[in-house]
Amino acid sequence: MVIISGASSGIGRAILSRISNSETKAAVFNLSRTPPEGVPNSLNFTHLTCDLSQPADIANVVSELRKLMPSEGRMLLVNNSGFGAYGEFPAPGVDHTLKMIDVNVRAPVELTGRLWEELKTRGGQVANVASLAGFQPTPLMTTYAATKSFLLDWSVALDAEAKRHGIRCVAICPGPVSTNFSKAAGFASSTGLGGQTADECADEAVRGMAAARPVVVTGWKHKILAVFSARLPKPWAAAIGLRMIQRLRLDRFVKKA
């Protein structure tokens, strides 16, 4: 059984495509506000509408999952949904920032926690889509980077803790990817910083999940950056990050109020 949040677009949709191409007979569930397009009829697929920023929606969708899930078989939970924001804190607004924390942090923790007993009984894997931004503090994307840092550390610690239960946890850490992220982050158009396509990222992610690697950084340039960033003192990393982002002049892509 496969459960993916946010498989309607971006990396989640690309991962769903790879599952479709594998000709798996496993039941596949998508949790998001809108269903993905073009899912082959051969796939045992169910879309469950869910706003992951709403705890009540998560509780309801887990109850629905328990009614629909097959009685046996290993479970793969892919916590993919998430979005970001660009600008000096608290831009673009406190409510937007709190919603980001709910979707990027609370939703993965709640989904995983509510399905934990099923995972322990069945065995399987939890894959959390974090980010290269999780390796260092990132000015002008402060809260987004912090949510991804949480996902990265939480996932690695959970993997160490859960192995004895037959559960593996994988943190997938893409760098810039050509998805709808720019629009959700408040940009009027693409920033042109997409270092990988969603398909390229998904290919590496799926290979890393199959190998149960605790941390999967996609893209060789991003792997180098992750190692470099992790070794720097955090104040240095933040100062260098601020200078680099300012030089990119991302403000020119931001939607005008």
Question: What is each PLM-predicted segment?
Answer:
Residues 8, 16:
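N-terminal Rossmann NAD(P)H-binding glycine-rich loop of SDR-like oxidoreductase domains
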Residues 42-56:
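Rossmann-fold cofactor-recognition segment
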Residues 80-85:
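Conserved NAD(P)H cofactor-binding loop of Rossmann-fold oxidoreductase domains
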Residues 88-101:
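Substrate-binding pocket helix/loop in short-chain dehydrogenase/reductase
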Residues 112, 147:
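Active-site helix of classical SDR
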Residues 131:
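Residue(s) in the substrate-gating loop at a strand-loop-helix junction
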Residues 171, 189-226:
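C-terminal helical subdomain
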